[in-house]
């Protein structure tokens, strides 16, 4: 089977493709398309995205960053939910009082000892030292007059 002549020389195919694309991209700068026309000979129409340039790229970057942060938050929320569900399915944590312990305490035969609040009211006196008036300040002489012309 013979290879077609155009595929034997791929550079010819590339040149033909580029010439077709450039013919399509020639600008027809009418009144409604004027803002998207780029300078050149012949003038070519820029795409809307090239026209708005930096605004699009900044917005795109902000959107990508926001999307990544949002997805990370969703993943963290799902992970927390999974961990909480797995934790609640296990037994109680170490150190939590079980019902057998509560029953042992409540079934104690003797009454608890009397409780008094008085020891809480007796606190050591930790007061500041007594008030001592500040010594009178010595009077400083008034400052010298301003060296400029008087205001009179």
Curated annotation (Swiss-Prot):
Topology feature Extracellular, residues:
28-59
Sorted alphabetically, which keywords does the UniProt record give?
A: Membrane, Signal, Transmembrane, Transmembrane helix
- Localization of this protein: Membrane
Q: Where is this region: Disordered?
A: 130-152
Q: Where is the signal peptide?
A: 1-27
Question: Gene Ontology cellular component?
Answer: membrane
Q: How does it sit in the membrane?
A: Single-pass type I membrane protein
Annotated transmembrane regions: 60-80
Chain ranges on the Cytoplasmic side, renumbered to this chain? 81-152
Family listed: Belongs to the CYYR1 family.
Tell me the protein's name: Cysteine and tyrosine-rich protein 1
């Amino acid at each position: 089977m013979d290879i077609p002549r155009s595929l034997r020389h791929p550079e010819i195919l590339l040149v033909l493709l580029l010439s077709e694309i450039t013919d399509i991209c020639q600008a027809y700068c009418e009144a409604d398309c004027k803002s998207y026309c780029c300078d050149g000979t012949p003038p070519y129409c820029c795409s809307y995205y090239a026209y708005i340039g930096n605004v699009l790229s900044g917005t795109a970057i902000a959107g990508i960053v926001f999307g990544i942060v949002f997805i990370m938050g969703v993943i963290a929320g799902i992970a927390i939910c999974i961990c909480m569900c797995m934790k609640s399915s296990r037994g109680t944590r170490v150190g939590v009082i079980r019902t057998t312990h509560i029953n042992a305490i409540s079934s104690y035969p003797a009454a608890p000892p009397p409780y008094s609040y008085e020891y809480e009211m007796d606190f050591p006196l930790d007061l500041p030292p007594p008030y001592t008036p500040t010594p009178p300040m010595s009077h400083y002489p008034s400052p010298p007059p301003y060296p400029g012309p008087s205001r009179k």
